[in-house]
Amino acid sequence: MSALSIRDAVPDDAELMLDYIRELAEFEHLSAECVATAAMLRRYLFEDKRAHAMMAEWNGAPAGFALYFYNFSTFLGRPGLYLEDLFVRPAFRRNGVARGLFRALARKAVAEGCGRFEWSVLDWNENAIRFYRGLGAVPLDEWTAQRLTGEALQRLARET
């Protein structure tokens, strides 16, 4: 029997997911931007069902998680799966936890008829980039991510 188990998250996982998110934000040097709360996670993942998560355990110990949502490709005419965050605690890395989460997400994408499975990675995270190449992922160098947030988002929404 494998030491790794992966399951869908449940509302009682919200605090643990928030811990993972904060650990990830610290690793990415983005702690100041992390304003999520466990209540927000419970609302958007389990009440509104705007996103989903999987929890990874190693020999029963909390090891990591993946948070994802569905988007849509107009060109493919099919949904896609977008991985927002994946985090594995340092003590559990290099044991196949991340690969197990990716495999579970790929299976979910295939089962749901998704035409693609995408995510973003910080350009300085070379270990993650190497790992993703090993999975068969390819960079989308011709695309540049764009984001509206804060006052810019509010200003555009107020336009008449």
Indicate residue ranges for each PLM-predicted region:
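A short, internal acetyl-CoA/4′-phosphopantetheine-binding micro-motif in the GNAT/acyltransferase core
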Residues: 86-93
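Conserved GNAT acetyl-CoA-binding A-motif
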Residues: 110-120
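A short beta-loop-alpha structural element at the N-terminal edge
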Residues: 5-17
